[in-house]
UniProtKB/Swiss-Prot annotation:
GO terms for molecular function: toxin activity. The primary structure of this cryptide TyPep-8 is identical to that of cryptide Pep-7 from Tityus obscurus (AC P0DRF2). It comes from Tityus serrulatus. This is Hypotensin-2. Expressed by the venom gland. GO terms for cellular component: extracellular region. It is found in: Secreted. Residues 11-25 have a biased composition (Basic and acidic residues). Residues 1-25 are annotated as: Disordered.
Amino acid sequence: AEIDFSGIPEDIIKEIKETNAKPPA
């Protein structure tokens, strides 16, 4: 599923992507 990043600041997008890249605890 794609996430709609429209209207979201670049730094927030980066933070979300980095969080998604981490394996679940």
